[in-house]
């Protein structure tokens, strides 16, 4: 049997899964509802942070090329793996808006897909900025300014320093974080040094995760708490997680399935408005819909691979 190989980080994929569960939970699609785990946008902040972290390295080869190729890469690299389920989700939201009255609580033009659209717009803007500004340190200064502005909007009276401002800031934090060298201990005994490095990174990951979960679980809402989570603890989680070589098929599955937990919330809007009008009652529908979208995506990707293999054989 061939050895399973993956470039994905298992701990990041695990947190993707937990954050997708968190989003569905706060949208009310769980049998048990609680007023704890405040800050429904925090998991989306984490998604933005991770996207920014991996963005700089992936976009480098397009900095000197065509603008349209770069923007195409920004869009296609984030949708190619699940394009058919994304089309299904977008179509269901569009149909829901046509059939039922607009309700800002659940049913607005993009609904739960706003994250994908915002990510595409923000990353495209950052890509254009990278093409104009050739010196990395100037780009980093601009990222620092964006972070300060986006995480200080509450000072201007904007409630909860709105989502649209937090997204660019979290992407900027991710891009700056990706440039920080990894912690590596140097000793004469290389194996011992590697083990010590992994141990220190693991401790950092556990502490960052534990503090973030503790602060999130507190029922009170405080600006300082969200700033601490967004600027220190979430970056700490990503930094230490990407320094630990945890990989495996199980973690990749969780990361892949997290996308469909997120997307599945769109098709069940139709069922919600037509029948139940109760988000808790949609829990089982959400589970079934996520599994169906996951199966469709696996089938589509399998067909793509088969076609590619047949073309390679024919050539």
Task: Give residue ranges: language-model regions.
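Internal transmembrane alpha-helix with an interfacial aromatic "cap," most often the third helix
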Residues: 56, 121-126, 174-185
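Alpha-helical membrane segments in multi-pass integral membrane proteins
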Residues: 143-150, 166-169, 228-234
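Short glycine/serine- and small hydrophobic-enriched flexible loop segments
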Residues: 57, 61, 130, 175, ...
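Membrane-cytosol interface segments of multi-pass membrane proteins
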Residues: 1-156, 192, 198, 257, ...
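Hydrophobic, aromatic-enriched interface-forming segments
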Residues: 152-178
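Short, solvent-exposed loop/turn elements at domain surfaces
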Residues: 32-33, 163, 272
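Residue-level hotspots within the lipid-embedded alpha helices of multi-pass solute transporters
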Residues: 115-119, 163-167, 227-228, 286
């Amino acid at each position: 049997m061939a050895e399973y190989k993956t470039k994905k980080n298992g701990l990041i994929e695990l947190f993707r899964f937990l954050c997708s569960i968190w989003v569905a939970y706060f949208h009310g699609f769980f049998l048990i509802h609680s007023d704890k785990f405040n800050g429904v946008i925090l998991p989306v902040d984490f998604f933005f942070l991770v996207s920014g972290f991996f963005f700089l390295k992936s976009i480098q080869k397009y900095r000197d090329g065509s603008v349209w190729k770069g923007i195409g890469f920004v869009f296609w690299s984030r949708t190619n793996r699940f394009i058919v389920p994304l089309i299904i989700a977008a179509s269901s939201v569009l149909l829901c808006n046509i059939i039922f009255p607009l309700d800002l609580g659940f049913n607005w033009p993009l609904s739960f897909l706003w994250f994908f659209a915002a990510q595409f717009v923000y990353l495209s803007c950052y890509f254009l900025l990278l093409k104009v500004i050739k010196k990395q340190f100037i780009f980093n200064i601009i990222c620092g300014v964006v972070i300060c502005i986006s995480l200080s909007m509450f000072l201007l009276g904007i409630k909860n320093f709105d989502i649209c401002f937090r997204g660019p800031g979290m992407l900027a934090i991710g891009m700056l974080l990706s440039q920080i060298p990894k912690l590596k201990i140097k000793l004469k005994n290389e194996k011992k040094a590697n083990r010590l490095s992994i141990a220190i990174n693991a401790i950092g990951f556990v502490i960052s995760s534990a503090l973030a979960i503790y602060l999130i679980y507190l029922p009170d809402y405080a600006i300082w708490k969200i700033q601490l989570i967004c600027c220190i603890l979430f970056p700490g989680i990503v930094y230490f997680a990407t320094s630990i070589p945890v990989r495996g098929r199980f973690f990749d599955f969780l990361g892949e399935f997290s996308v469909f937990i997120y997307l599945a919330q769109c098709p069940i809007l139709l069922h919600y408005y037509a029948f139940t009008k109760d988000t808790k009652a949609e829990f089982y529908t959400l589970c079934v819909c996520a599994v169906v979208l996951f199966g469709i995506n696996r089938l589509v990707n399998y067909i793509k691979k088969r076609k590619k293999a047949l073309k390679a054989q024919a050539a």
